[in-house]
A protein has these predicted regions:
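Beta1/beta-strand and adjacent pyrophosphate-binding region of the FAD-binding site
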Residues: 2-13
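N-terminal Rossmann-fold NAD(P) dinucleotide-binding loop
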Residues: 16-17
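Active-site substrate-recognition segment that forms the wall
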Residues: 21-25, 83-85, 191-192, 196, ...
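Glycine-rich FAD pyrophosphate-binding loop
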Residues: 24-45
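Dinucleotide-binding Rossmann-like beta1-alpha1 core, especially the glycine-rich loop
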Residues: 49-126, 255
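Flavin (FAD/FMN) cofactor-binding and adjacent substrate-gating region
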Residues: 75, 95-169, 175-181
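Flavin (FAD/FMN) cofactor-binding core of flavoprotein oxidoreductases
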Residues: 121-125, 146, 281, 293-356, ...
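Predominantly flavin-linked oxidoreductase catalytic cores and closely associated redox partners
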Residues: 147-232
Length: 386
């Protein structure tokens, strides 16, 4: 007879590791299952660091969740004794009518968040590291910064185990079923049963969820580290996390973003930057860690255009995965097939910062059938007419 658990969590990545921790903290008997080791490079959180920010340009409804996320990141730092968050401020730059600048102002005004506005000349004076087109303006959020993503997943997984959670790695979930007695999970090595099931399998969510009306689009994204020609200009403490919306600047597209440099090897070697953009849909198993010449050009292009003092030798390129919903917003809800099953997916390249609070959300949904956190806008109902 297989062991019977209170909750099984499929996918021990960003959201799943945090869910295992919050479930175990409440005394639940938890099993986390992942097809890879934890942490691993074949993931959405690969690449050392992720941005965290409060003035959320994507939609102001995320801000209450972010406030809770900040508190819970501090909580796991204190409980584990592990540094995960660096507060550097986040600088946004773009044209006034672009989505980034207008979205940042909407979020800050809606939720009364600290955020200063910079004219083009003020931006050039305060941050001479950038050479931006005439007409671009800035917004500076003091509370933002970045998280150590792989270290955070490992920290949550280890904390969950200390609290009694069991983790099975390198074990692939093949299928699941649910009835009045509970849920059953069939894996590459056997089967497991539980009262409740949480599905948060990242790029592999589509096959497990069995929801054809809610397509998930998986894309390959690259992250690069460059050794700047003038590294002294880009050190943590003097240089913020940055985000440039090039909308309106000919030949540039997507969102370019990056991080300050530090001496911590957990953050990579050099100045990290990347491009947030739709990219080409792929099957998750088609995306490997192989890199190409075009990847290097994608990393260097924004430096040539906006940060000439950061140009230099590309040190490292890494690959991560986006799992995009059709509207770019997360999907967190009860599965329509069963009250015993909840899921989180479609984090669309901007989800990691929410891992701390999403773990709590998922634990409450599984154990209580509801959550105190405001996630209504992330539900399945918005796809009812799609």
């Amino acid at each position: 007879m297989p062991n019977h658990y209170d909750v099984i969590v499929v996918g021990v990545g960003s959201m799943g590791a945090a869910a295992c921790y919050h479930l175990a903290k409440r005394g639940a008997k938890v099993l986390g299952i992942d097809s890879q080791q934890v942490p691993n490079t074949n993931s959405s959180y690969n690449g050392n660091t992720r941005v965290i920010r409060l003035t959320y340009q994507e939609h102001p409804d995320y801000v209450p969740l972010l406030r809770d996320a900040y508190l819970l990141w501090r909580e796991i730092e204190q409980e584990s004794g592990t540094k995960l968050f660096h507060k550097t401020g986040v600088l946004y730059a773009g044209f006034p009518d672009g989505e980034a600048i207008s979205g940042v102002h909407l979020a800050s005004e809606t939720h009364n968040l600290p955020c200063s506005t910079l004219t083009h000349s003020e931006l050039a004076k305060q941050f001479p590291q950038f050479t931006l087109p005439e007409g671009m303006v800035g917004a500076l959020e003091p509370e933002g910064g970045y998280l150590l993503s792989e270290r955070a997943v490992e920290t949550y997984a280890q904390a969950a185990q200390r609290l009694g959670a069991a983790l099975l790695t390198s074990e692939q979930v093949i299928d699941w079923s649910s009835n009045a007695q509970g849920v059953s999970i069939r894996t590459s090595d056997g089967s497991h049963v539980a009262a409740k099931l949480i599905l948060c399998a990242g790029a592999w969510s589509g096959g497990l969820l069995r929801l054809p009306a809610v397509p998930l689009i998986v894309t390959r994204q690259v992250l690069g580290w460059v050794q700047p020609s003038r590294p002294e200009l880009f050190q943590r403490g003097d240089f913020p996390v940055w985000n440039i919306d090039p909308h309106g600047d000919r030949g540039m597209s997507g969102i370019y973003y990056g991080f300050p440099m530090s001496n911590d090897p957990a953050e990579g070697n050099g100045l990290k930057l990347a491009r947030h953009h739709p990219s080409t849909p792929m099957a998750p198993d088609e995306i490997t860690d192989e890199t190409f010449a075009a990847d290097e050009e994608e990393i260097l292009l924004p430096l040539r255009r906006y940060m000439p003092d950061a140009l230099g030798q590309v040190q490292t390129i890494k690959v991560c995965k986006y799992t995009n919903s059709t509207d770019g917003h997360f999907i967190v809800d009860r599965h329509p097939e069963s009250d015993r099953v909840h899921f989180a997916c479609g984090f669309s390249g901007h989800g990691f910062k929410f891992a701390s609070v999403m773990g709590n959300v998922l634990s409450e949904l599984a154990l209580d059938g509801k959550t105190q956190h405001p996630i209504g806008f992330l539900g399945l109902s918005r796809f009812a007419n799609s």
